[in-house]
Amino acid sequence: MANYTAADVKKLRELTGSGMLDCKKALEESAGDFDKAVEILRIKGAKDVGKRAERNATEGLVAVSGNTMIEVNSETDFVAKNDEFKNFAAKIAEAAAAAKANSPEELAAVDVDGQSAQDALQEFSAKIGEKLELRRAVTLEGDNVAVYLHHRSADLPPSVGVLVAYTGEGEEAEAAARQAAMQIAALRASYLTREDVPAEVIEKERSIAEQITREEGKPEQAIPKIVEGRLNGFYKENVLLEQASVADSKKTVKALLDEAGATVTAFARFEVGQA
């Protein structure tokens, strides 16, 4: 005869989030000792987390709180769109914002109800039976930060998130900054200004442009000018302020920001599963 009741199983499930069969086995193994059963399930959960660590977590969501944005990965979109997972990520984002987390290491260490975010993640991972990962975090400085979150479909959480720190007051400046955030989400700008492009990247692009131009058989005296033109094309594709605006292709992003009295000082873009 079992030395536990259905109420014990129910209570254990509610406390640990484990399945009914696992709860029954734990109570049997502990001879009905409830606290021991909890310990057994926690140990089992930790072992299962270790097994899940070998699997890839490429789904998930982007969450924002204040000036902070985080990415939390799961293995499947089934978990990603689960309300419990979304609420968990929102809680981590709030803690990350309070700590101004700005790296994966800082994100993992933030305090969540008296334990680290990483420990909270492992417990939640054991509960839902799927590998989870605290991928990254960024916090932008400034009083004004525009946010844009993009959903691949209505039933999924945000898979792309953008933060844009800006200066400027009023609704026009706010709208222009949000439009810039949407631009970054769509066209994946890598740099704010051309001065932000690393010298090694410029040299690589210049070398590629020169090689292509020579292979096209252009006159030697024309090569430098053609190379500079192609380098300018690189800037127009990859530098936010030099991109043609998706809102008005006849104007650059900078021109529209200037018209609204807004100046972008920094931005960050996260896409689930991407670098």
Curated annotation (Swiss-Prot):
The keyword Transit peptide does not apply. Its main location: cytoplasm. It comes from the Bacteria. InterPro entries: EF-Ts_dimer_sf, Transl_elong_EFTs/EF1B, Transl_elong_EFTs/EF1B_dimer, Transl_elong_Ts_CS, UBA-like_sf. The keyword Protein biosynthesis applies. GO terms for cellular component: cytoplasm. GO terms for molecular function: translation elongation factor activity. It is found in: Cytoplasm. Keywords: Cytoplasm, Elongation factor, Protein biosynthesis. Residues 76-79 are annotated as: Involved in Mg(2+) ion dislocation from EF-Tu. Belongs to the EF-Ts family. Associates with the EF-Tu.GDP complex and induces the exchange of GDP to GTP. It remains bound to the aminoacyl-tRNA.EF-Tu.GTP complex up to the GTP hydrolysis stage on the ribosome. This is Elongation factor Ts. It comes from Corynebacterium efficiens (strain DSM 44549 / YS-314 / AJ 12310 / JCM 11189 / NBRC 100395).
